[in-house]
Design a protein with these regions (language model features):
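Generic alpha-helical secondary structure signal
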Residues: 15, 33, 44, 53, ...
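Conserved P-loop NTPase motor cores
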Residues: 1-13, 19-27, 33-144
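P-loop/Walker A phosphate-binding loop and immediately adjacent motor/lid segment at beta-alpha junctions
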Residues: 129-168
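Conserved P-loop NTPase motor module
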Residues: 153-201
Length: 201
């Protein structure tokens, strides 16, 4: 059965780079469906880019997606090839460059500035939530925290931001805000939202 939100139909190849994928028993399905590498190095990105460019015109290259999971702060340095690739990946016929991290500030400024879509799950560290608000709150004109609370209330829910349009969603389906406007009537208290109080070390 073709799962994973139809990724096999959307892309000719999906490349997943993860330091921990072999420690996750549920990842066996990903390993069957996609190209999976254990870890990250700048050379991997260079090889992918060169391979894509070897097809000549962009339209002749395979349409690919790259997912980098849990690689930040380990093998990834500032000004890495991944950061550089973020500014030119569409020229290599890469339709998706997704980066998952548990440490927001470990993401290079270049990557953050070139992000068109942001997914934020419920945070357990107050300082990290503040950093995310500092980064993206201006787009939502002081309503970021309220949108976060509405979106992440409930198990497994997340806040999805479309930076180019200023739209905010609960998960992918329900639009809850746009720039400084909240489009739903519900309001969530800090206690109900489980806002973090731990600032970390």
């Amino acid at each position: 059965e073709n799962g994973f939100y139809g990724a096999q139909d959307l892309f000719d190849e999906v490349i997943i780079m993860s330091n921990t994928i072999h420690n996750d028993s549920t990842a066996r399905f990903l390993k069957k469906a996609f190209t999976v590498t254990d870890g990250y190095s700048d050379g991997m990105i260079t090889d992918i880019y060169n391979k894509q460019k070897s097809f000549g015109e962009k339209k002749n290259a395979p349409f690919i997606a790259i997912v980098a999971d849990d690689i930040l702060g380990k093998n990834l340095k500032r000004n890495s090839e991944l950061s550089f690739f973020a500014t030119r990946f569409r020229h290599a016929n890469c339709g998706l460059l997704a980066i998952f991290t548990q440490n927001f500030k470990s993401v290079d400024t270049i990557l953050r500035n070139n992000s068109s879509d942001i997914i934020i799950f419920k945070q357990t560290n107050k300082r990290q939530l503040e950093q995310i608000e500092e980064e993206y709150g201006g787009v939502y004109e002081g309503k970021f925290l309220e949108l976060y609370k509405i979106a992440t209330a409930g198990k497994y829910n997340f806040l999805y931001l479309r930076m180019k349009t200023g739209e905010a969603f609960r998960n992918f389906e329900e639009k809850i805000g746009e720039y400084g406007n909240i489009l739903v009537g519900e309001r969530i208290s800090d206690t109900e939202a489980g806002l973090p109080t731990d600032t970390g070390a």
